[in-house]
Amino acid sequence: FITKAIPIVLAALSAVNGAKILEAGPHAETIPNKYIVVMKKDVSDEAFSTHTTWLSQNLNRRLMRRSGSSKAMAGMQNKYSLGGIFRAYSGEFDDAMIKDISNHDDVDYIEPDFVVRTSTNGTNLTRQENVPSWGLARVGSKQAGGTTYYYDSSAGKGVTAYVIDTGIDIEHEDFGGRAKWGKNFVDQRDEDCNGHGTHVAGTVGGTKYGLAKSVSLVAVKVLDCDGSGSNSGVIRGMEWAMREASGGGNGTAKAAGKSVMNMSLGGPRSQASNDAARAISEAGIFMAVAAGNENMDAQHSSPASEPSVCTVAASTEDDGKAEFSNYGAVVDVYAPGKDITSLKPGGSTDTLSGTSMASPHVCGLGAYLIGLGKQGGPGLCDTIKQMANEAIQRPGEGTTGKLIY
């Protein structure tokens, strides 16, 4: 998160004999006439295909009947299928069409699409002296104030990290050729024109600035030059990354277990976003997610509120809770997130603050541990919590004081 996550409560509006239509809270930046439609868990691929055929036919009939003054809706624009347990589609629909969709037996719930933003406000052991970011030294030390990062030479080798963000400057020399472009779901610019994603990726796996110095990095661009994008676009990026991490869509558990994902972004609480994240976790992929920067309970943000992901709050250099960091029972661990120095597009560096900077410390640590032979997947978050120190002073009501180590 860059500055604030939007507090939201999803309230179900009644749809007569139909699916729930979830209403965004008053501060959500909803996108007019854009919706995410989620199918019931027992809907098969065949039934899903039949449903989308019905949808197209219904839309065509409405198009033929519409008046010349009414705006034509684009209809279905994206389809999602994550792990066989989350099937959905998104698109542009008018109120009458949404009512028809909500009354279809296959539909579980519908929620408005909205804007999502970045979350910025930062063995054979090798010694890295005088580290360029205090976060590296803190992860490698039991006490605050260190300047050295100790790491095993494996350093995440053989592991792939998917950075779902604003893109990555894959030519930055600190990546040493280990970063590559994956997929762009937001614009026509296959570059990081914002800088957030490059900074995050640098903490995950930069040669000088990262925790997992040998990890492979993949850019999944879902946020634009302003650091924003749609929730439906983010879910498309999540779906693509899951397929790639699972062996190019072949669903191999071995490939999934050697992959990690980082999501230093978020928005209002979204059942669709949480369900997509849970599908990724159930596919055996470790996910680190920023808790958000509104100094409120992270249960109101997504995907931070999804229990199966590893939700990360931000700490300061003196082991305090960063003043902006979200908190609450959904937070799994704290990680350095205030004044974190990492990479900037064009070959330079930048210092940023936010739970966006904390989450990649956990993602990088996850990749590092998998490289050492630890079991991947969502259970890796429990391993990280067991290794963590109870170090955070005044972590927030009902919040763990554990800081990664």
From Swiss-Prot:
Every Peptidase S8 domain range: 133-405
Subcellular location: Secreted
Disulfide bridge partners, by residue number: none
Glycosylation sites: N121, N124, N250, N262
Propeptide: 19-125
Cleaved signal peptide residues: 1-18
Pfam families hit by this protein: Inhibitor_I9, Peptidase_S8
EC numbers for this chain: 3.4.21.-
A GO MF label: serine-type endopeptidase activity
Principal cellular location given in the protein's record: secreted
Active site: D165 (charge relay system), H196 (charge relay system), S356 (charge relay system)
Function statement: Secreted subtilisin-like serine protease with keratinolytic activity that contributes to pathogenicity.
Protein name from the UniProt record: Subtilisin-like protease 6
